[in-house]
């Protein structure tokens, strides 16, 4: 009980070393998207080899945060593959290329905050190759995009996301306000 009293209500913070190197690191862009597309093509080959059919006109891609960002990249790289994107809080540029990632675990006795710094954030990059606004400019999008975005998203403000989607064919924005938060499916109006 003595240790619990010492720790009670405290927050501990520390930088976590991410084990990345030149051969294995989170590139956060096109390479990750190509990995996803390769996995999908392998799945398609397995289905074909086993005589299993699927409706090629009903392939959707879903993601949350960085996963939704990757969904947009996959759609841009393979514009006729997906009939739709379900986007939960995608940013338009990889957030962690400009910011450290902070993860907080709130426990009963104390909280632990971890800070991750990705190797890719220190590299010189062609920013346009990561920027969805640039990549979708003039792009003839065929996928229906259904986007869920909170009014208080701290990673990408709603007005920026709305402006982007206004310029993309087939995009529909569902704004998450306090009225939609139910604590189960929708837990906040922030980045979730």
Each language-model region and where it sits:
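Short linear motifs at secondary-structure transitions and domain/linker junctions
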Residues: 10, 17, 35-38, 61-63, ...
